[in-house]
Amino acid sequence: MQRVTITLDDDLLETLDSLSQRRGYNNRSEAIRDILRGALAQEATQEHGTQGFAVLSYVYEHEKRDLASRIVSTQHHHHDLSVATLHVHINHDDCLEIAVLKGDMGDVQHFADDVIAQRGVRHGHLQCLPKED
């Protein structure tokens, strides 16, 4: 491991310290290493043909006209990407789904876009991780 020196604006350093404290890092170096790993992983997943894993989470209104069946249809259309799906009833109207996906990151992004773009889907978020050799 090597030691490096960086220069940060006071506001950015304060933000880093606040983030480090909230997330329970023992020091700034650990926080910066995790931030860099996250940025590198995100960049790697944007390369065409990259294999990886992803978690797609979203909330949707299960009573919205045909929405549940449209989502299921989209999932079946991309069955080769799906590893597992967790379905949670949040309240009378809303459901949370969490899908674990595996495959080409371009295909995963396309699947996520198809789901998140559905009318009645809210809070859609895709977290991608490149497959490490």
Swiss-Prot record:
Cofactor comment text: Binds 1 nickel ion per subunit.
Cofactor(s) needed: Ni(2+)
Biological process according to GO: regulation of DNA-templated transcription; response to nickel cation
Binding site for Ni(2+): H76, H87, H89, C95
SUPFAM superfamilies to which the protein is assigned, alphabetical: ACT-like, Ribbon-helix-helix
GO molecular function: DNA binding; DNA-binding transcription factor activity; nickel cation binding; sequence-specific DNA binding
Keywords: DNA-binding, Metal-binding, Nickel, Repressor, Transcription, Transcription regulation
InterPro entries: Acetolactate_synth/TF_NikR_C (IPR027271), ACT-like_dom_sf (IPR045865), Arc_rbn_hlx_hlx (IPR013321), CopG (IPR002145), CopG/NikR_regulator (IPR050192), Ni_resp_reg_NikR (IPR022988), Nickel_NikR_proteobac (IPR014160), Ribbon_hlx_hlx (IPR010985)
Pfam families per the UniProt record, alphabetical: NikR_C (PF08753), RHH_1 (PF01402)
Assembly and binders: Homotetramer.
Record PANTHER family: NICKEL-RESPONSIVE REGULATOR
Family of the protein in this entry: Belongs to the transcriptional regulatory CopG/NikR family.
Function of the protein: Transcriptional repressor of the nikABCDE operon. Is active in the presence of excessive concentrations of intracellular nickel.
Name recorded for this polypeptide: Nickel-responsive regulator
